């Protein structure tokens, strides 16, 4: 691994609130989207001349459109409950990575232009003009938030910094200041159908290769169908599952589950992506346009059910937004959840005894589980409260003998972010990603030391990609991370009657 241009934080035995380092991350900004990327999404190609007036007008539009945003602007009492809850503050010490300080970047503009006191007595209420210097701060620090929502769990008023960040990014896009990584990915989905830009013929070839590899492993014809009309299930999964390790191991696991259960399924070349970066940039229209591919594919293929693969923010969009974005789903079989997570699907089969496992097949692994933010704090799973926590763990303990959770304050709804979500999984933000992973790495280190953990399962493509990149910075092997259905794939018994 190449030498990093920054210092990796030291792992500590006990969590420590860092000393404040003013401006520690002020230098870090993601690449700005070039004109062609902006134009393709309908945004101004470069920063518009009257950007200040348009930004203020856009803020006014969002304040009227999303009542919660105005509540968040008004409700904060600066109690400090959130200040040490952000993984980026814990990893960098930059006070502007405290959730309250990140909110205040917008709040001081809100007060200046949308409150009586701010208009006439700005200094008394901390209101400031929207200058280019302030805009640059916005671009830096609103692109240092992974929208994980951990801070909102601890806020006594439930202020959601993720929503504030989304609003700020939407404002910046509207005046021609977009983030390259996220906007480039959204453009690929519109042009090709997935985040990685894998065209249909390449996808078909990849799936054929996986079928051959799986037959070599199992001796059985486990299918990876594409664009099959009349299949019962349409699987919408992150495109990383088609492309790289460890993601592809979970795709193989999905296929084995469908095979063992005897349920017909298909992937779609039109909707070959579960991820939806429209949510990360806070743009409802982009989110809807990406999601509409799923509806069109489901109608075209005539499926009865839609199942979503292992992707955290994709599941949040599906669970929390699809109904209003692309519903109603009256053309699907209403006996099943709409949509349904692949873990719900597999767990249901396990509970009914429809699939069986050899748990000993995973005995070389001592497993822990990383709760992904958008699953933990942006959705549910199954019919019971907390199902998003119970179901993945129940699958793991059904397919493996050795499982240990990490420390209680680092899991479930208090889980720490992987450090790469929210549109930040780009190498121009690598320093932030590595430092932001510190709290999770410390919890993992404790589990390794106390229980001999050697495998961290997760159900998010971004988490898998992020951990694969940052684990070596903290002395761990990148192969330590993988999907829940990677474990399922290893243990499932195929061909049993």
At which residue positions do the language-model features occur?
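Cofactor-cradling patches in redox/metallo enzymes
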Residues: 158, 242-332, 376-387, 391-398, ...
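Extracytoplasmic substrate-binding proteins
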Residues: 173, 294, 324-332, 346-362
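C-terminal amphipathic alpha-helical segment
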Residues: 342, 348-397
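Iron-sulfur-cluster electron-transfer modules
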Residues: 11-15, 19-22, 45-49, 57, ...
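Intrinsically disordered, low-structural-confidence terminal and linker regions
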Residues: 1-40
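Short hydrophobic beta-strand segments
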Residues: 232-242, 365-376, 457
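Iron-sulfur (Fe-S) cluster-binding segments and ferredoxin-like electron-carrier domains
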Residues: 84-112, 153-172, 380-386, 423-437, ...
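Short cysteine clusters
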Residues: 76-82, 86, 145-151, 155, ...
